[in-house]
Amino acid sequence: MKQIVALFLFVAGFASGQTSHFPDLEWKEKDLDHFTIRTKSTGTDPARRYSEKTYEVMLEILPGLEGDFEKNEFRTPGGQEAGKEDRFRFTTYLVETDHDFHSCVMIDAKRHNWSNGNVQITKQVGNYLDQMNRYLVICKSDPEQSGGGREKDRKEILVHSLGTALMKSRTHQADLPFWMTAGMGYYAEHKVFDRCSIYYLDFEAYYRQNPDAKVDARKGGTLGPQESWPRILRKLCKGEKRVSLEKTLGAQIVTLSPNESGYIFALNYFMVSTNERTKKYQGFITSIRTGAKPTKDLLLKTMGYGDDASFEKDWYEWMMSSKFK
């Protein structure tokens, strides 16, 4: 099954943090330790089941999340608090129907001056993250089907999006490169489900049009939701089908390939694959939080490398080892 997550660059001024993001809609509410779940005409899963699991995964590599949440040190990219409560809770909105989802989209479109193109794409995809890192909205049925139809399993979208959102919240930034946001979403998926299922392109169509991109024409030769991404990527790396650091950092949705998606995941995983690397990754995030741009030079410097070649040597060796699993 193909699942696609929304990831757009919305350019707008930043309003003050709000506790009630869609006050004109009626919500049922449930608080978890670090999350508030608001539902309309549907249940609290998958948020009730997987939100705290995702938080624990991200807390292991970004311990500063504890202060952001439990001491309410969270700040939007514009520097505002999310609310006046004693602690911050990230909010997940779950709606059943396309009508309610479209209502949320239009409220945010007006609030942040979205373009018509972004509005239409968001309505089609059926999920989006708040650009100020405070909440996530998911339509649990088909957002393009009138009345919604049957609810779908959205747990992968939830975990992927929360992984992205929690990392972004530590940077106090709205505009981060695709390799960081998508890659950390994939990392969270892998840690929670031992697989990656969220696509930013149609993998099946890509492989039909580009059969040489497969590792092997036989079973297990392509990246997909039923395959172990580390196993396939290990084959790619050993087979010299490698994506350079430069190309991985410059990946864009419009030109993305499945292999680039895999290397984006592998890069983020590599950067937190040992305690030493995790501390350096935390330094990278802290630098961005204090205003630095997430450039290749900053990444190499904070991770302790002088050039692309030395970074790639360690990265590829790790990918080809049994430690990448």
Name what the model sees in each region.
Residues 22-23, 121-135, 153, 172-325:
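Acidic/His/Gly-enriched intrinsically disordered linker/tail segments
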Residues 22-177, 294-295, 299:
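Juxtacatalytic substrate-recognition/specificity segment
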Residues 15-19:
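Boundary at the C-terminal end of the N-terminal hydrophobic targeting segment
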Residues 3-13:
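Sec-dependent N-terminal signal peptides
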Residues 11-13, 162-163, 303:
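Generic low-complexity, intrinsically disordered sequence content enriched
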